[in-house]
UniProtKB/Swiss-Prot annotation:
The family this protein is said to belong to: Belongs to the Turandot family.
Positions annotated as glycosylated: N49
Predominant cellular place of this UniProt entry's protein: secreted
Gene Ontology, cellular component aspect: extracellular space
Localization (cell): Secreted
GO biological process, alphabetically ordered: cellular response to heat; defense response to bacterium; innate immune response; response to bacterium; response to cold; response to heat; response to mechanical stimulus; response to oxidative stress
Protein name as annotated: Protein Turandot A2
InterPro entries in the record: Turandot
Entry function: A humoral factor that plays a role in stress tolerance; gives increased resistance to the lethal effects of bacterial challenge and stress. Regulated by the JAK/STAT pathway and NF-KB-like Relish pathway in the fat body, upd3 in the hemocytes and Mekk1 in response to septic injury and consequent immune response.
Pfam families cross-referenced by the UniProt entry: Turandot
Signal peptide interval: 1-21
Taxon lineage: Eukaryota, Metazoa, Ecdysozoa, Arthropoda, Hexapoda
Domain of life: Eukaryota
Length: 129
């Protein structure tokens, strides 16, 4: 009896991570949400405000991507973010977009909008193949 209980618990431990993955329904919902974000973000402020949501979708999608896709987008995102370190330890969240502090200036607004458009394009390509 004891060995069957142990075997059952072991089987549950092996199966449970498979049940909590990024499902096809989640992927389809995120694909629709990306298209909606890109379509609805008509002005610069809307694009800047939607950047975080694009990053959140990318973070959900991250485990299901190929190594090449992850490295490509990570490199792009890291080029546009700064690590915030206090006493050598990253703050909660670990990174802050460079563009956030620069949004005030009109010249930097173009950089932020360009980041949104490029990130949106890269993530949308992941869904369309």
């Amino acid at each position: 009896m004891n060995s069957s209980t142990s075997l059952m618990c072991f089987a549950l431990l092996l199966i449970s991570p498979l049940c909590m993955g990024y499902s096809d329904e989640d992927r389809e919902a995120d694909s629709r949400r990306i298209a909606e974000i890109i379509q609805n973000a008509q002005d610069d402020d809307a694009k800047i405000n939607s950047t975080q949501e694009l990053l959140d979708i990318y973070r959900r999608l991250y485990p299901s991507l190929s190594l090449e896709d992850r490295e490509n987008i990570d490199k792009f995102v890291n080029e546009h973010t700064d690590a915030i370190v206090i006493d050598g330890v990253p703050i909660q969240g670990g990174r802050k977009a460079k563009i956030i502090g620069k949004i005030v200036s009109p010249a930097a607004k173009g950089l932020a909008v360009g980041f949104f458009e490029e990130l949106g394009s890269k993530i949308a390509q992941l869904f369309t193949g």
